[in-house]
Structures are given as structure tokens and as C-alpha cells.
Amino acid sequence: MEAIKKKMQMLKLDKENALDRAEQAEAEQKQAEERSKQLEDELAAMQKKLKGTEDELDKYSEALKDAQEKLELAEKKAADAEAEVASLNRRIQLVEEELDRAQERLATALQKLEEAEKAADESERGMKVIENRALKDEEKMELQEIQLKEAKHIAEEADRKYEEVARKLVIIEGDLERTEERAELAEFKCFELEEELKNVTNNLKFLEAQAEKYFQKKDKYEEEIKILTDKLKEAETRAEFAERSVAKLEKTIDDLEDELYAQKLKYKAISEELDHALNDMTSI
């Protein structure tokens, strides 16, 4: 009799354990179904996003073609203008050499002048010109320092956004690992759903890789358009500059301005790339 009671208790305990496992399996099955639905929604969104990216790539291809045609015309115009500028520069060089010789003769004549007051006035005017130029150079340097600080601030902000995205990605990966561990404990009823979930995940990864490929092509087209646009602007500026007046050629100032403009474009491009990366990773 005692053995029968023990047997009944064991059967009752097995029944309770079986019920617990059944409830746990049902809960995990529900979670797997919800996860499958979520991934299906993400898959549909990714397909829609890929369609938009393909349309946008077509648009960038047309824009790239137009920019290349404009660049060819501008480069031809710039080449003609540069040839004229080279000729004018040779003439300017001859004039400058003659001017140097004349200035040397003038300096020799001035040294022989007996009127010290006139020489002092000339020296004073020369000092004022030098002081004015030095003041302008200092103002320009201050402006460049301010612009450089702004560029550094943009780069620091971009680094901060990148670190924030990296932290979010680590959290998401941790959540995904825990979810996969719980899904592995499900009973045979959720096994088929897990297989379907794996297939959907593989499709999603494939689409993500495809999207990354399109994004890279998009970035490449954007960079090429940007480079061609910059070259077009530079060629047009050089042509207009040469046609307008050779006397306005101030090589040192132009080099500094071009270098500063390139740095601003560089930091702006870095900020935009990191913003795109942040948006893409957040949407994923």
C-alpha cells in the first residue's frame, strides 16, 4: 500500500513537471512567433528600403553623367584660360624683373639723396604698409583658428555619436544572444518555428549585405559627384579669375583659402558619413 502511495505521488509530481514544461514550451513558442513576426516586418522594411536605394542610385548615375559633361567643358575653358594666364605670367615676370632692376636703381638713387626727411617719410609709409599687411595676416590667422576649432568640434561630436552607436550595438547583440539561448530551450513544437526563424534571419542578413553594397555604391557615386562638382567649381573659378584680371592673382592667399576650404569639406564629409552610419545602424 505504501509503495502504491509513493508511486501515486511520483506520478503526480511527474504530471506537475510535465504541465510546467508544457507551459514553458507554450510561452517560448509564443515568443518565437513574435520574434518571427518582427523579423518578417523588418524584412519587408528592408526590401522597401532597397527599392528606394536602387531608384536613388539611378538618380545619382544621371547626376554623375551631367557633372562629368560639365566638368569636361569647364576643364577645356580652364585650359584655355590657363594658357592665357601662363602667357600673361611670363609677361608679368619680365615686367617684374624690369621693375626689380628699376627698384634697385631707385634704391641706389635714394641712398644718394641728401633730403633725410623725404627718406624718413618713405620709410614711414613703408612701415605702415607692412603693419597693415601684418594686421590683416593676424586677422586671417584668427579666423582660420576659429574655423579649425569648429572643424575639431564637428569631429569630436562625430566620434561621440560613433561611440554611442557602438554601445547600443553591444546591448542589442547581448539581447539577441539571450533570446537565442531561451529559444534553444523550447520543446519540439517550436522547433519548426525556429527553423523558419533561421531562414528569415538568413534572408534578412542577405538583404542587409545587399543594402550595404548599394549604400557603398551610393556613397561612391556621391563622392564622385562631389569631387567632380568641386573640380567644376574650381575650373570655372580659375577661368573667370583669369579672364577678369591677371593682376588679381595672389597665389599665397588663394593657396591658404583653398587649403582651408578643403579641410572644411573633409570634416563636413566625415560628419555626414558618421551621421549616415548612425542613422543606418539605428534603423537596423
From Swiss-Prot:
The modification Phosphothreonine is found at T53, T108, T252, T282. The modification Phosphoserine is found at S61, S87, S271, S283. The modification N-acetylmethionine is found at M1. The keyword Cell inner membrane does not apply. It comes from the Eukaryota. The keyword Phosphoprotein applies. One of its GO terms (molecular function) is actin filament binding. This is Tropomyosin alpha-3 chain. It comes from Sus scrofa.
